């Protein structure tokens, strides 16, 4: 499973507040699955920290998938497909979607825009 940036932000906020919310519950429901992240999410998530070490300590609990050229080509294909249908994702979401499709793994996100991407199964939290 590939966790998108909004999931990471929600899970981090729940941990800071010491409460179980939707992201924590999702991790519990899928405790036998491996939650992975993209380098794109690392960039987006860490932008919210004055000290990148704080972000690193939190993100180190997840396995980061490599962004191979093939995943970038998938992102390009997704962009073409969505342009043809009259809509697009943002650049970061495009790369996250391309990574999920390249690896053939579900995407954990509340972003319904990902539902327009052929070949991706979105798991809402």
Each model region followed by its residue ranges:
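Active-site neighborhoods of divalent-metal-dependent phosphate/nucleic-acid chemistry enzymes
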Residues: 64-108
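Short, hinge-like loop/turn segments at secondary-structure boundaries
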Residues: 52-56, 82-83, 124-125
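Short, well-structured N-terminal submotif of metal-dependent ribonuclease cores
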Residues: 1-36, 46-57
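Nucleotide phosphate-binding site architecture
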Residues: 8-9, 43-46, 115, 123
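A secondary-structure boundary/capping signal
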Residues: 4-5, 38-41, 110
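Acidic, PIN/NYN-like endoribonuclease modules and their adjacent C-terminal/linker elements
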Residues: 97, 101-125
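Short, structured coil segments at secondary-structure junctions
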Residues: 58-62, 118
